[in-house]
Amino acid sequence: MNALACLAEAFAWLIRPGIRRFILLPLAVNITLFAAGSYAAFHYSDALVESLLPGWLAWLHWLLYPLLAVALLILTYYSFSLMANLIAAPFNSLLAAAVEKAERGDPSPPATPLWRDILMSLIQELHKLLYFLALALPTLILALILPPFAPVLWFLYTAWCAALQYLDYPMANNAVPFHAQRARLRQNRADTLACGGAISLLTTIPVLNLVAMPVGVIAATLYWCRHLRQP
């Protein structure tokens, strides 16, 4: 798939001249928050999983416990990823702009005040967060009603949200409204879910999760430039 090819290529961009300087601060944010996420996941997951298992399914405890544990682990890491993206949003937008400039060879866009970039990035992140929370509610209800399908439901949720999270940076830089972003990604649903799912899985792999954020931004920008951006 096109998006997965861009994701694989994104790792090489981490050391590309002109790109590295935009990665250092988001990388520091990622390391700090994923350390906190790992601590929370491994110290509180058992009690939470036990509380989510209904008594009438006790006979399936051996099967449902590992499934819910995996779903909770993915959700925990993705929650901390959202926090990291909120904090690093202005710098991720700069990284996306630098990658797009290098990929397309365009001249630099007109400079805007840093405070304005930070403010607009934070507003956009809050907008996305509200959308993600609104989408999480029906997903949670379905997961509670159908516990055996909870891991699949949460994986689809995190894949869609991760794709929106990272593709927003290059698309917002090109003044594509959030509702138009969602419409465009629905037209490329398979590629979108594959990319988002791969990035979500990347956040759960030790060591690789430390570079998941910049890799996700770079991959999303390459995918935007090569396959989504209209001439």
Regions found by a protein language model. Name each.
Residues 1-136, 140, 178, 187-192, ...:
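Helix-coil boundary and N-terminal low-complexity module in membrane systems
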Residues 65-100, 143-173, 207-231:
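Selective recognition of hydrophobic, aromatic-rich stretches within alpha-helical transmembrane segments
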Residues 170-183:
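Alpha-helical transmembrane segments
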Residues 184, 188, 204, 226-230:
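Hydrophobic alpha-helical segments
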